[in-house]
Amino acid sequence: EKVEKIYYTEQTKNDFRAVSEKVQKKFLKDYKADTPEYAILFFTKGFNGEKIEVRNEEEIIFVDGVTTDKTTGLAKNMRIKVTLDTEIYDKATKKKIYVKSDKVGKHKFIYIMKDTDGEQPYKITYSDKLRPAK
C-alpha cells in the first residue's frame, strides 16, 4: 500500500488583522459563498506564476498560473465546496496538497502559502477571518 507523502502543514488561526464583519459578509455574498457548503480558498505568499490546478471529485475548479501580488500578499482566490475534499496540484513542484472537508468544518476562509525551502513547502491556514487586501 502506497502511503502518500504529506507536503503541507495545517493550522487554524483567527488572531490577525481582519476586515469588518460587514465587509466580510458582503465578500462572501459576492462570491456566492454565504451558505455553509462553501468557503473561499486563497493562494497567498510564494507563488510566481506556476500553473496550479484545483479540483474536487465533481469538477475542475481552476487551472491557471498563480502569481502573488507583492503589495497585498495575495495571489488568487476562489469558491470551493467544503462538503468535498479539494485537491490542489502545483505543476512546478509536481506536488499535491489537500483541503479536507472534515478539516474545513465551519471555517469560511482557507489560505495557502508556499515556501519552497522545506520538506513541506505549503502551509494551509483555516480561518473565520477575511484578511484585508491592503
Q: What residue ranges belong to the model's regions?
A:
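Terminal leader/tail segments of proteins
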Residues: 1-134
